[in-house]
């Protein structure tokens, strides 16, 4: 996977599944963000459930929203 410039990648745990493929994720630094699934994960039907460990990409412009890019097995 290619690294993107200016993107913050951080691990977290999904705490709640919301409508429209949105999730509330608690990050390792105890912040809570709203995250959606990346397009490739959607394309490959990767399911995300509460209590899953995930990697979230955050934009430096809005640290309250993110994109889930990986789910640990």
Swiss-Prot record:
State if rRNA-binding is listed as a keyword.
yes
Q: Where in the cell is it found?
A: Cytoplasm
Q: Cellular component per GO?
A: cytosol
Q: Name one GO molecular function term.
A: rRNA binding
Which keywords fit this entry according to its UniProt record?
Cytoplasm, Initiation factor, Protein biosynthesis, RNA-binding, rRNA-binding
Q: Does the keyword Cytoplasm apply?
A: yes
Gene3D superfamilies in UniProt: Nucleic acid-binding proteins
S1-like domain location: 1-73
Tell me the InterPro entries matching this sequence: NA-bd_OB-fold, RNA-binding_domain_S1_IF1, TIF_IF1
Assembly notes: Component of the 30S ribosomal translation pre-initiation complex which assembles on the 30S ribosome in the order IF-2 and IF-3, IF-1 and N-formylmethionyl-tRNA(fMet); mRNA recruitment can occur at any time during PIC assembly.
Q: Which family does it belong to?
A: Belongs to the IF-1 family.
Q: What does this protein do?
A: One of the essential components for the initiation of protein synthesis. Stabilizes the binding of IF-2 and IF-3 on the 30S subunit to which N-formylmethionyl-tRNA(fMet) subsequently binds. Helps modulate mRNA selection, yielding the 30S pre-initiation complex (PIC). Upon addition of the 50S ribosomal subunit IF-1, IF-2 and IF-3 are released leaving the mature 70S translation initiation complex.
PANTHER family registered for this protein in UniProt: TRANSLATION INITIATION FACTOR IF-1, CHLOROPLASTIC
What HAMAP family would the database entry show?
IF_1
Q: What is the protein's name according to its record?
A: Translation initiation factor IF-1
Q: Which organism is it from?
A: Paenarthrobacter aurescens (strain TC1)
Top-level taxonomy: Bacteria, Bacillati, Actinomycetota, Actinomycetes, Micrococcales
């Amino acid at each position: 996977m290619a690294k993107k410039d200016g993107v913050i990648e951080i691990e977290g745990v999904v705490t709640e599944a919301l409508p429209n493929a949105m999730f509330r994720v608690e990050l390792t630094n105890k912040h809570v963000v709203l995250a959606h699934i990346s397009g490739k994960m959607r394309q490959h039907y990767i399911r995300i459930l509460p209590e899953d460990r995930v990697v979230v990409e955050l934009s430096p412009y809005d640290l309250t929203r993110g994109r889930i890019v990986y789910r640990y097995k």
